């Protein structure tokens, strides 16, 4: 399997990437795109099914674009993810490595996400089976997921296996009410229509947040919209936060928009080891709560804290890792690009009465400088959890200048992690590697690496 989750076929030295098939399948392929060194294709006929193939459990498999590895048993999924980490670190990093620990699989392989966002559209995607029936469909409104490569088309989702079933019941109830009362769904090209997005967040504390996003251009639409909100509140009394956002822009970003409370609170909480983390409608929080806890425990274990260390937490986000390790450190300093995330980090520190954590907002390469190190002290430990692109060269240079005893590198992209490890290799030796599966049925894998000063 390739890193993008596609299977690989070879014809006369031409490498062909094929989605929705598994090693051992015998298929006819149709080339969809050809480059100099590789091609992309799709399977048009199956002659023989692989003995390792699993039966997809989701009725939307192969259309919605998510959970592409349902056709692999979970044991095979994590085997390929383990191999992906090993291949990236060895082929890209080209550094000396210890034995890589077996990947930590997810206890939950279904209903493991705590957040899903659904899109409304008046252009429902018709599946191949529906098109072949040559029937005119009266109801072309849909709420579900975007179709890959067709931004204005949405696949109507009946059941998604990623979030607790309350999510399915809420989405389907909203859809049916909107159908019955003739609410307009947004046209993603012309931006006409009322209903835009539906976000559902659950938490380990049992709280439930629902955010409905709409476009309101006339007074009577607001009254209609509030009737929908009241229907949701009456139908699902377990909702602890029913919120709405009016978005009259031409895009779906909500960071610059006000959030209004229709019922309940404007936030909910996640809990780990007695710590409470406030999660608002715009807050980032790892979407697999149980596996995030395991990931953070690994990072803390690798950090080897005794209570005397100054810890820098780079790309701290909402400060979850920083606050999580603070009780084992002398002081923690978190740095993050997004100001709103830093405000969340400070709030979470205050909620948990954490006095030894400081947080700073700014671009990492501009914030983490030699002057910053000289002012705040040389860290004993650096924990870094960068975005998929990895760390900027300037950030790597300052880490090398700071010379912490240990670096804990948490990555959602082992390829860029491997590149960065190579840049650190002159001064640091990799001591431990622990892959973690946060997203079953996808090709994505997290990896935690411990480096120690040579």
From Swiss-Prot:
Enzyme nomenclature, EC number: 2.1.1.-
Cited Pfam families: TRAM (PF01938), tRNA_U5-meth_tr (PF05958)
Gene3D superfamilies named in the record: 2.40.50.1070, Nucleic acid-binding proteins, Vaccinia Virus protein VP39
InterPro entries registered for this protein in UniProt: MeTrfase_TrmA_AS, MeTrfase_TrmA_CS, NA-bd_OB-fold, SAM-dependent_MTases_sf, TRAM_dom, U5_MeTrfase_fam
Claim: Magnesium is one of the keywords in the record: no
CDD domains linked: AdoMet_MTases (cd02440)
Domain TRAM per the UniProt entry, residue ranges: 1-45
Annotated GO MF terms: 4 iron, 4 sulfur cluster binding; metal ion binding; rRNA (uridine-C5-)-methyltransferase activity
Residues holding S-adenosyl-L-methionine: 286, 315, 336, 385
Key word Repeat present: no
Catalytic machinery residues: 412
Residues noted as binding [4Fe-4S] cluster in the record, renumbered to the chain: 58, 64, 67, 160
Alphabetical GO biological process terms: rRNA base methylation
Keywords, comma-separated and alphabetical: 4Fe-4S, Iron, Iron-sulfur, Metal-binding, Methyltransferase, S-adenosyl-L-methionine, Transferase
Similarity comment: family membership: Belongs to the class I-like SAM-binding methyltransferase superfamily. RNA M5U methyltransferase family.
PANTHER family referenced in this protein's UniProt entry, alphabetically: RNA M5U METHYLTRANSFERASE (PTHR11061), TRNA (URACIL(54)-C(5))-METHYLTRANSFERASE (PTHR11061:SF30)
The protein's name in its UniProt record: Uncharacterized RNA methyltransferase BT_0643
Species of origin: Bacteroides thetaiotaomicron (strain ATCC 29148 / DSM 2079 / JCM 5827 / CCUG 10774 / NCTC 10582 / VPI-5482 / E50)
């Amino acid at each position: 399997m390739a890193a993008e989750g596609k299977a690989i076929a070879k014809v006369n030295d031409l490498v062909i990437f094929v989605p929705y098939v598994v090693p051992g399948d015998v298929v006819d392929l149709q080339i969809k795109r050809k480059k100099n060194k590789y091609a992309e294709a799709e399977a048009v006929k199956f002659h023989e099914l692989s003995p390792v193939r699993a039966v997809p459990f989701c009725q939307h498999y192969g259309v919605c674009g998510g959970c592409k590895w349902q056709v692999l048993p979970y044991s095979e999924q994590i085997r390929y993810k383990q191999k992906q980490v090993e291949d990236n670190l060895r082929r890209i990093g080209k550094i000396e490595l210890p034995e890589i620990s077996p990947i930590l699989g997810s206890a939950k392989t279904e209903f493991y996400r705590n957040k899903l966002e659904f899109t409304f559209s008046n252009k429902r995607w018709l599946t191949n089976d529906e098109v072949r029936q040559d029937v005119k469909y009266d109801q072309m409104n849909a709420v579900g997921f975007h179709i890959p490569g067709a931004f204005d088309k949405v696949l109507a989702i009946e059941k998604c296996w990623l979030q607790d079933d309350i999510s399915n019941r809420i989405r389907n109830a909203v859809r049916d009410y909107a159908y019955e009362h003739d609410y307009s769904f947004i046209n993603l090209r012309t931006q006409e229509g009322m209903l835009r997005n539906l976000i559902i967040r659950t938490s380990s504390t049992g709280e439930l947040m629902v955010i409905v996003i709409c476009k309101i251009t006339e007074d009577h639409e607001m009254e209609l919209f509030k009737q929908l909100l009241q229907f949701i509140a009456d139908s699902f009394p377990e909702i602890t936060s029913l919120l709405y956002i009016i978005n009259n822009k031409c895009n779906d970003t909500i960071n610059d928009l006000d959030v209004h409370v229709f019922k309940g609170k404007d936030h909910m909480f996640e809990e780990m080891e007695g710590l409470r983390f406030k999660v608002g409608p715009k807050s980032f929080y790892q979407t697999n709560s149980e596996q995030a806890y395991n990931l953070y425990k690994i990072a803390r274990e690798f950090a080897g804290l005794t209570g005397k260390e100054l810890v820098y937490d780079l790309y701290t986000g909402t400060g979850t890792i920083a606050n999580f390790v603070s009780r084992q450190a002398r002081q923690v300093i978190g740095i993050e690009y997004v100001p709103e995330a830093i405000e969340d980090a400070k709030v979470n520190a205050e909620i948990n009465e954490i006095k030894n954590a400081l947080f700073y907002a700014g671009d990492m390469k501009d914030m983490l400088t030699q002057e910053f190190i000289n002012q705040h002290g040389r860290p004993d430990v650096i924990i870094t959890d960068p975005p998929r692109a990895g760390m900027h060269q300037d950030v790597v240079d300052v880490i090398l200048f700071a010379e912490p005893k240990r670096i804990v590198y948490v990555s959602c992209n082992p390829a860029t992690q491997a590149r960065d490890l190579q840049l650190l290799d002159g001064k640091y030796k990799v001591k431990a590697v622990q892959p973690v599966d946060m997203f079953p049925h996808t090709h994505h894998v997290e990896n935690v690496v411990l480096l120690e000063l040579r």
